Amino acid sequence: MLRAAIAFFIIAIVAYIFGASGVAGMSVEIGRILLFVFLALAIISFVINLVSGRKP
């Protein structure tokens, strides 16, 4: 699960970079949405990993 959290975090950062670079007006909104979606998934995965107590 920790690997999934890290993967979601990296995807969130990449989505933000593409969205914030100003390629197109719509890409900014899409990048922001993807940032929050994947950041939320990363946090959820990390919390589940902490609660379950299993090692990755």
From Swiss-Prot:
HAMAP family: UPF0391
Statement: the UniProt record of this protein carries the keyword rRNA-binding: no
Family named by the database record: Belongs to the UPF0391 family.
Topology relative to the membrane: Multi-pass membrane protein
Name of the featured protein: UPF0391 membrane protein Bd1438
Taxonomic path: Bacteria, Pseudomonadati, Bdellovibrionota, Bdellovibrionia, Bdellovibrionales
InterPro entries to which the protein is assigned, alphabetical: DUF1328 (IPR009760)
A UniProt-annotated Pfam family: DUF1328
This protein's UniProt keywords: Cell membrane, Membrane, Transmembrane, Transmembrane helix
Compartment(s) of residence: Cell membrane
GO cellular component: plasma membrane
Superkingdom of this protein's organism: Bacteria
